[in-house]
Amino acid sequence: MKTLIAAYSGVLRGERRAEAARSENKNKGSALSREGSGRWGTGSSILSALQDIFSVTWLNRSKVEKQLQVISVLQWVLSFLVLGVACSVILMYTFCTDCWLIAVLYFTWLAFDWNTPKKGGRRSQWVRNWAVWRYFRDYFPIQLVKTHNLLTTRNYIFGYHPHGIMGLGAFCNFSTEATEVSKKFPGIRPYLATLAGNFRMPVLREYLMSGGICPVNRDTIDYLLSKNGSGNAIIIVVGGAAESLSSMPGKNAVTLKNRKGFVKLALRHGADLVPTYSFGENEVYKQVIFEEGSWGRWVQKKFQKYIGFAPCIFHGRGLFSSDTWGLVPYSKPITTVVGEPITVPKLEHPTQKDIDLYHAMYMEALVKLFDNHKTKFGLPETEVLEVN
């Protein structure tokens, strides 16, 4: 603004000097020299003003981009936490209003469509390609690293580690096209598996299905691996709620030793196992960790047992400032590395020995994947993956 005022003042001074020269009509050479000097000074000031305007515009654009990134992340966090409950309350309320017909129509549709999530849902490439997901990706940023090709003639079960608080890397990489998963693995259809209870929530279920998210239960996985052709990739966050309870910055630990159900499913369908590790997933939120035996951990375990998820006391940054607490995750890089597939035979009735063998192979492959890539993403060579 100061530069613009200076430029405008320069224009006025130049015009006054020129007018004085014409009226006095004395030294023509001197007058022409002064007029030329005024014009060059004015041009220089205007150019400087324009440069300042462009630089301010660029800075403002940068700030707008950052705020759009924050908003895009916050909308997903709020959807994850409250959309289902909020929509349930709103629909129940409409029964008591003149809009009761809307609720009746929706619940009629819900009854008709109840089993759709179990058959892979209704993915929408339009939703998966929304621009909001690119802002979501750039906020952290999030990237997907491919180490090996996947055959479209095979089906796969990806074990995703660690869970983190919300599994933000899993969502961005496999339920949107922000990191171009379909281009990196052409012909492969990713299905991120999450709690079946989410699909009993009105509106939220439609939102989840549009991204290719499905319930993490046996019926759904059996259907996708046996009746949906080949080229399917089921992404299972193996550690689940138990792993989220120990999520904290600086910690690389997975809950895996006693998680063998996904291996049994892979054997029954002959689906290859793919170890997947997300570096930085635990860095984006801080939470209160309750020690084993404490009342807080007791409450969390009861929730986990009867409801399927464990409530966490966590925080990120505020909406307008990174110096305040809020629900927006911290802007920390998340890099998801997809490892080499482990070829699994199809055994209709796998024995415990078979399950233990391929589970051990999977654990070994996951640790190897972690060790091969840890130094590339800021971890020291001495960092060890803790397998619980």
Curated annotation (Swiss-Prot):
List the catalysed reactions.
Answer: an acyl-CoA + a 1,2-diacyl-sn-glycerol = a triacyl-sn-glycerol + CoA; all-trans-retinol + an acyl-CoA = an all-trans-retinyl ester + CoA; 1,2-di-(9Z-octadecenoyl)-sn-glycerol + hexadecanoyl-CoA = 1,2-di-(9Z)-octadecenoyl-3-hexadecanoyl-sn-glycerol + CoA; 1,2-di-(9Z-octadecenoyl)-sn-glycerol + (9Z)-octadecenoyl-CoA = 1,2,3-tri-(9Z-octadecenoyl)-glycerol + CoA
- The catalytic activity of this protein is classed by the Enzyme Commission as 2.3.1.20, 2.3.1.76
One family from Pfam that matches here is DAGAT
Topological relation to the membrane, as annotated: Multi-pass membrane protein
**Can you say where in the cell this protein is located?**
Endoplasmic reticulum membrane; Lipid droplet; Cytoplasm, Perinuclear region
Membrane-spanning parts: 70-88, 93-112
> Top enzyme class of this protein?
transferase
Which processes are annotated in GO (biological process)?
cellular response to oleic acid; cholesterol homeostasis; diacylglycerol biosynthetic process; diacylglycerol metabolic process; fat pad development; fatty acid homeostasis; glycerol metabolic process; intracellular triglyceride homeostasis
> Which top-level group of life is the source organism from?
Eukaryota
User: Which CDD domains would you find in this protein's record?
Assistant: LPLAT_MGAT-like (cd07987)
GO CC terms: cytosol; endoplasmic reticulum; endoplasmic reticulum membrane; lipid droplet; membrane; perinuclear endoplasmic reticulum membrane; perinuclear region of cytoplasm
Q: Which organs or tissues contain this protein?
A: Predominantly expressed in liver. Also expressed in testis.
Q: What results from gene inactivation?
A: Mice are lipopenic and die soon after birth, apparently from profound reductions in substrates for energy metabolism and from impaired permeability barrier function in the skin.
- Could you give the subunit structure recorded for this chain? Forms multimeric complexes consisting of several DGAT2 subunits. Interacts with SLC27A1 and this interaction is enhanced in the presence of ZFYVE1.
This molecule's function is given as:
Essential acyltransferase that catalyzes the terminal and only committed step in triacylglycerol synthesis by using diacylglycerol and fatty acyl CoA as substrates. Required for synthesis and storage of intracellular triglycerides. Probably plays a central role in cytosolic lipid accumulation. In liver, is primarily responsible for incorporating endogenously synthesized fatty acids into triglycerides. Also functions as an acyl-CoA retinol acyltransferase (ARAT). Also able to use 1-monoalkylglycerol (1-MAkG) as an acyl acceptor for the synthesis of monoalkyl-monoacylglycerol (MAMAG).
Protein name (record): Diacylglycerol O-acyltransferase 2
Gene name of this polypeptide:
Dgat2
